[in-house]
């Protein structure tokens, strides 16, 4: 009986020690590296705006699969609202290196829909997988480049789905090589856990940003890059605006 009691006591002590070594579930989770409600945090809200006139791009002419795609498709490279708000601009808080804070918490996809990539622009954490798929009844392709380097080139019949991992930071341009010359999309891969893409009004919101001073980077496929400084204070909304001009677009 004494031997059995000692064995049970040893087992309990061992399990207790193991629990201390492993830590709590929150400490070992990817979620633990995200800002929590108990930490001082604020919000960033802003807008990307185009100042001055610009020439609205003409639609692309379609040369292949016109029976499905039609004779032309819209050019999504510069979408501007009535008050100058720029859609599909990427906003990233620079200087926060925390790739685990969001990686794996969301599903990312690039679809072929109505002869266009959807979404046209997205931002994903470095290390994420992206699902490539095709909801059109015609053959598509996803040819991804970072600069001049090909990351992947995948044929996509309507039945095929493929996952690809994005393991490096940078701007990835995706095109369709199946003579769909108008098709393009951009995937911005970042290690910052705080990012956004502007909506149709050119606006964005980034929640739960730890209090502090930051640089914010703005990028748009046609308008280029800008950087702004911002102070985030606990419980407050910090406002920022990036204004671009369009000399060559």
Label each PLM-derived region with a short phrase.
Residues 30-249:
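Extracytoplasmic copper-binding redox domains, predominantly the cupredoxin/blue-copper superfamily
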Residues 1-8:
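N-terminal secretory signal peptides that target proteins for export/translocation
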Residues 3, 28-29:
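Short, low-complexity, intrinsically disordered N-terminal modules
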């Amino acid at each position: 009986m004494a031997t059995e009691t000692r064995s049970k006591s040893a087992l309990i002590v061992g399990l207790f020690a193991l629990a201390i070594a492993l830590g709590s579930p929150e400490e070992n989770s990817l979620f633990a590296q995200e800002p929590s409600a108990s930490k001082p945090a604020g919000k960033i809200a802003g807008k990307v705006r185009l100042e001055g006139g610009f020439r609205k791009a003409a639609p692309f002419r379609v040369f292949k699969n016109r029976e499905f795609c039609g004779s032309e498709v819209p050019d999504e490279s510069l979408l501007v609202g009535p008050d100058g708000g720029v859609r599909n601009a990427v906003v990233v808080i620079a200087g926060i290196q925390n790739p685990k804070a969001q990686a794996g918490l969301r599903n990312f996809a690039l679809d072929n829909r109505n002869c266009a990539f959807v979404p046209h622009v997205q931002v994903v954490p470095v290390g994420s997988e992206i699902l490539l798929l095709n909801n059109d009844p015609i053959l598509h392709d996803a040819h991804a480049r970072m600069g001049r380097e090909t990351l992947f080139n995948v044929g996509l019949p309507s039945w095929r789905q493929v996952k690809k991992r994005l393991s490096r930071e940078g701007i990835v341009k995706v095109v369709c090589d199946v003579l769909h010359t108008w098709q393009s999309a951009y995937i911005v891969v970042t290690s910052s856990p705080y990012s956004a893409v502007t909506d149709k009004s050119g606006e964005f919101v980034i929640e739960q940003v730890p209090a502090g001073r930051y640089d914010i980077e703005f990028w748009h496929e046609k308008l280029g890059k800008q950087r702004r400084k911002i102070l985030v204070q606990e419980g407050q909304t910090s406002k920022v605006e990036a204004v671009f001009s369009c000399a060559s677009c």
